[in-house]
């Protein structure tokens, strides 16, 4: 092996290691508490303390009841929003589970939609949302 190729390979490895570790900050070794106090810019005594408060069983029951009330009110609101006037049935329409291939008219049921399978060779009207 040529000496210059060996020297270039060593230099390449050194540069790779230097590039990998150059972004890391140097570690400071603190010898005692005095150097810690002099080096730190923030005084630890000035920071507010953190207090942890345990919840009692009564407060947990109240929050659970409130959550259940919120859930029930949301369900009632969603049921009220769903109720909407249905469109009158048009005479030329396809019944539920009937064939609705693209030249056919729309489905009779207002909540039904035409679903096709096998590259639009088999199409039928199906109700997707039962609570519509």
From Swiss-Prot:
Disulfide bonds: 93-108, 100-114, 107-125, 111-132, 116-123
Gene3D superfamilies: Agouti domain (4.10.760.10)
Pfam families on file: Agouti (PF05039)
InterPro entries: Agouti (IPR007733), Agouti_dom (IPR027300), Agouti_dom_sf (IPR036836)
List of glycosylated residues: 39
GO CC field: extracellular space
Annotated Agouti domain residues: 93-132
Keywords from the UniProt entry: Disulfide bond, Glycoprotein, Knottin, Secreted, Signal
Protein localization: Secreted
Keyword Disulfide bond found: yes
Comment on protein domains: The presence of a 'disulfide through disulfide knot' structurally defines this protein as a knottin.
Free-text function comment from the UniProt entry: Involved in the regulation of melanogenesis. The binding of ASP to MC1R precludes alpha-MSH initiated signaling and thus blocks production of cAMP, leading to a down-regulation of eumelanogenesis (brown/black pigment) and thus increasing synthesis of pheomelanin (yellow/red pigment).
Name of this chain's protein: Agouti-signaling protein
Source organism of the structure: Leontopithecus chrysomelas (Golden-headed lion tamarin)
Gene: ASIP
């Amino acid at each position: 092996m040529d000496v210059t190729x060996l020297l270039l390979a060593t230099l390449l490895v050194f540069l790779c290691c230097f590039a990998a570790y150059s972004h890391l900050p140097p570690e400071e070794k603190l010898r005692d508490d005095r150097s810690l106090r002099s080096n730190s810019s923030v005084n630890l005594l000035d920071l507010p303390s953190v207090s942890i408060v345990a919840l009692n069983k009564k407060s947990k029951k109240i929050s659970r009841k409130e959550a259940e009330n919120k859930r029930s009110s949301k369900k009632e609101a969603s049921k009220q929003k769903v109720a909407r006037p249905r469109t009158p049935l048009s005479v030329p329409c396809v019944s539920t589970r009937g064939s609705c291939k693209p030249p056919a008219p729309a489905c009779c049921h207002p909540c039904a939609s035409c679903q096709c399978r096998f590259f639009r060779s088999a199409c039928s009207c199906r109700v997707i949302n039962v609570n519509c």
